[in-house]
């Protein structure tokens, strides 16, 4: 009984599987028949279209820019540090107790402004003593001169000897010398009193105070009272390769001050503009560079002592230069070249001679002319004589290109 029961179940399962397989097979044939007419129609239409696709594929998309003619400034660049035109540590020239400070930390001061005071009592006393001694010796001199006058009259009648007359004359001369010494003592005491009032020796900005009121200070203190840095004007010291010396000297011979620009650490913002002050008198043999100093008015306090900046010095301007985007300039086995577009948007390779350049623009001295269109993007897909599709043409007459040109003219280039 159990064996026949299992056999029936096996037969049922086999029948169900066979039915499902037959259904799938029949459904697949119907789908093939319904798709056949469309496929046949497509097959009838495809040969011509297929041959057309083989003959002409899609055009390579490129971006292009127009070569323009413009004046291009040439800059020499270097790294530099802002230095104060003068740095003065204000120290006391006399010993005594500091009784007053007359400045605020960070304040701009003028030469002669009162900065600090030392207790003047001892200096006033010394001055009074010197003045008293001077007055005493002046009285002695006056009396000696009167005696000399009497001796001279008596000597005419031989009432006094020649020796006595000479002695009186010597006394007068001695007293006159004493007077001069007294006058020097008075001047010295007055100077000590004057030095008890400490004034600014130069214009500039005071730093943080180095000593507090009430402290005893002396002329031998090395830290001083405060440091003044002169920042109006302020200097920039930067270095240039020794190969640039001839260029700078030649530009100086033109007779016009050379403009130097100070840019921030990231070279993205111009901080100030000044002029070349001088070149150092020797080259650093270790680095092969020479130090250059420029001076800035710095009335807006844009520059600060010990600030790191990028320096750019204008040495020449190339007029009527043919300029293209730097992205268009390529380098191959033959040398530098660009891809030039003709009126039919077909490209051809032109060997060129580049001049001064920066990250945005490059001057082309030979190989193309102003008005030529050059490929700036999509260059890796180009072959000689290929026709391309210009998807974004740029020209120096567009607002965007004008802005780029202005930025280029502002930043300049370096050969």
UniProtKB/Swiss-Prot annotation:
Q: Does the keyword Cell membrane apply?
A: yes
Keywords assigned by UniProt, alphabetized: Cell inner membrane, Cell membrane, Membrane, Signal, Transport
Entry keyword annotation includes Transmembrane: no
| Entry's induction text | The mdtABC operon is transcriptionally activated by BaeR.
Record-linked InterPro entries: CusB_D23, Multidrug-R_MdtA, RND_pump_MFP
Record region (Disordered)? 32-60, 392-415
Which SUPFAM superfamilies does its entry note? HlyD-like secretion proteins (SSF111369)
Regions of compositional bias (Basic and acidic residues) in chain numbering = 399-415
- Please give the biological process terms from Gene Ontology that the record holds: bile acid and bile salt transport; xenobiotic detoxification by transmembrane export across the cell outer membrane; xenobiotic transport
The organism's superkingdom is given as: Bacteria
Query: How does this protein assemble?
Result: Part of a tripartite efflux system composed of MdtA, MdtB and MdtC.
PANTHER family xref list: MULTIDRUG RESISTANCE PROTEIN MDTA
The record's similarity note reads: Belongs to the membrane fusion protein (MFP) (TC 8.A.1) family.
List the protein's name.
Multidrug resistance protein MdtA
UniProt lists the gene as: mdtA
């Amino acid at each position: 009984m159990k064996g026949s029961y299992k056999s029936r179940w096996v037969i049922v399962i086999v029948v169900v599987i066979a039915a499902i397989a037959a259904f799938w097979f029949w459904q697949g044939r119907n789908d093939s028949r319904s798709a056949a007419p469309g496929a046949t129609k497509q097959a009838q239409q495809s040969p011509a279209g297929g041959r057309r696709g083989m003959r002409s594929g899609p055009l390579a998309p490129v971006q292009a820019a127009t070569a323009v003619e413009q004046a291009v400034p040439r800059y020499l660049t270097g790294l530099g540090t802002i230095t104060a035109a003068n740095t003065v540590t204000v120290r006391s020239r006399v010993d005594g107790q500091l009784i007053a400070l007359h400045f605020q930390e960070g304040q701009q001061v003028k030469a002669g402004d009162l900065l600090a005071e030392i207790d003047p009592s001892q200096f006033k006393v010394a001055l009074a003593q010197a003045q008293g001694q001077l007055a005493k010796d002046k009285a002695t001199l006056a009396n000696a001169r009167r005696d000399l006058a009497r001796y001279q009259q008596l000597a005419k009648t031989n009432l006094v000897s020649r020796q006595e007359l000479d002695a009186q004359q010597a006394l007068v001369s001695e007293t006159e010398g004493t007077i001069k010494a007294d006058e020097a003592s008075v001047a010295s005491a007055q100077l000590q009193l004057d030095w008890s009032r400490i004034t600014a020796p130069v214009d500039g900005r005071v730093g943080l105070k180095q000593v507090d009121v009430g402290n005893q200070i002396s002329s031998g203190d090395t830290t001083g009272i405060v440091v003044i840095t002169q920042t109006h004007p302020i200097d920039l010291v930067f270095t240039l390769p020794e190969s640039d010396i001839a260029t700078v000297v030649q530009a100086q011979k033109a007779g016009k001050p050379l403009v130097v620009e100070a840019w921030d650490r990231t070279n993205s913002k111009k901080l100030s503009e000044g002029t070349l002050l001088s070149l150092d008198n020797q080259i650093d043999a270790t680095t092969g560079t020479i130090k250059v100093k420029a001076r800035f008015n710095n009335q807006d306090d844009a520059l600060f002592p010990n600030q790191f900046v990028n320096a750019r010095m204008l040495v020449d301007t190339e007029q009527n230069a043919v300029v293209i985007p730097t992205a268009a300039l390529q380098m191959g086995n033959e040398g530098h070249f660009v891809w030039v577009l003709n009126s039919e948007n077909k490209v051809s390779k032109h060997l060129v001679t580049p001049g001064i350049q920066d990250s945005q623009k490059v001057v082309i001295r030979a190989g193309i002319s102003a008005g030529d269109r050059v490929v700036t993007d999509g260059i890796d897909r180009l072959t000689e004589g290929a026709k391309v599709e210009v998807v974004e043409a740029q020209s120096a007459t567009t607002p965007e290109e004008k802005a780029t040109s202005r930025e280029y003219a502002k930043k300049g280039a370096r050969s």
